[in-house]
Amino acid sequence: MIRINYFNENDINMDFWKKFCNKILKTAYNYFNFNYDIELSITFVNDLKAQQINQQYRNHSYIADVTSFPVEMTENEIKAIGFRELGDMFINLNEAKRKAIKYNHDLNSEMGFLFVHGFLHLLGYDHEDSNDEKIMFDLQDQILKLNNLEYIIKFNEDDYLESN
């Protein structure tokens, strides 16, 4: 079973996105066929908070769309508490909307991508080198396709400049 604790630091009702995320991440949980329950937290944040988190913890000043902080646990710790705590994910709906428009994605695909991308980071996947990137992005594609979503990654370096 997957348990998701939601926190909303926006003035926007996020109930739709919570339900959408539950569906997406339940598919991801089933895809990996975990032999234990997992738990994670997702906080919906505004631009200022997303930028502050990115600056404080990653030393980048741009406004992030998703930021993940994994928790590492041993098998003994998982057995002791009965589930695996994955960590915390911060999602910025405003930045997701901007990128959906900029890259001509629908917002469901953009948000689905962010939920899966952040989830994979919580599991320890990364895209720092080309081999790891291929593995992570292939997993993203497979999980999104299971949810009838398609997401074509379009990278624009301007999105990650420090002056944003």
From Swiss-Prot:
* Cofactor note as given: Binds 1 zinc ion.
GO molecular-function term, one example from the UniProt record: metalloendopeptidase activity
Entry keywords, A to Z = Cytoplasm, Endonuclease, Hydrolase, Metal-binding, Nuclease, Ribosome biogenesis, rRNA processing, Zinc
The record's section on SUPFAM superfamilies has: Metalloproteases ('zincins'), catalytic domain
Entries under Pfam families matching the protein = YbeY
The protein's predominant localisation is cytoplasm
Where along the chain is Zn(2+) bound? Answer: H117, H121, H127
Q: Name one GO biological process term.
A: rRNA processing
Q: Which GO terms describe its cellular component?
A: cytoplasm
Which superkingdom is the protein from?
Answer: Bacteria
The reply to whether Mitochondrion figures as a keyword in the UniProt entry is no
Q: Which compartments does it reside in?
A: Cytoplasm
User: Which cofactors, if any, are listed as required?
Assistant: Zn(2+)
Instruction: Please state the Enzyme Commission number of this protein.
Output: 3.1.-.-
- Function of the protein: Single strand-specific metallo-endoribonuclease involved in late-stage 70S ribosome quality control and in maturation of the 3' terminus of the 16S rRNA.
As for family, the record states: Belongs to the endoribonuclease YbeY family.
Q: What's the protein name?
A: Endoribonuclease YbeY
Species in which this protein is naturally found: Mycoplasma mycoides subsp. mycoides SC (strain CCUG 32753 / NCTC 10114 / PG1)
